[in-house]
């Protein structure tokens, strides 16, 4: 599965969200991690029959599409909020923004 963001980048966004209470980008990052886990599970799951194999391939394909969509969503929200995507540093304006608990 193609990955636009590596685990360290996603974790950095999540870590900053915990400190500064900017939960929305972190929620998207968590969803991306969960989709990656689901995809890996489906790819590695043992199949006892042709039907089982088809089920796992169907889930993996849908997960791959959802993952691509969520990575594009993350890119867009980081652009909108003004995150530095070379360092994944949260913009100063968001650090002062009161947020909702994660």
Place the predicted regions along the sequence by residue.
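N-terminal acidic leader/helix
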Residues: 5-42
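Generic serine detector
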Residues: 11, 47-49, 86
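Non-transmembrane, amphipathic alpha-helical segments
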Residues: 16-30, 48-65, 69
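Secondary-structure edge/capping motif, primarily at the C-terminal ends of alpha-helices
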Residues: 17, 42-50, 77, 81
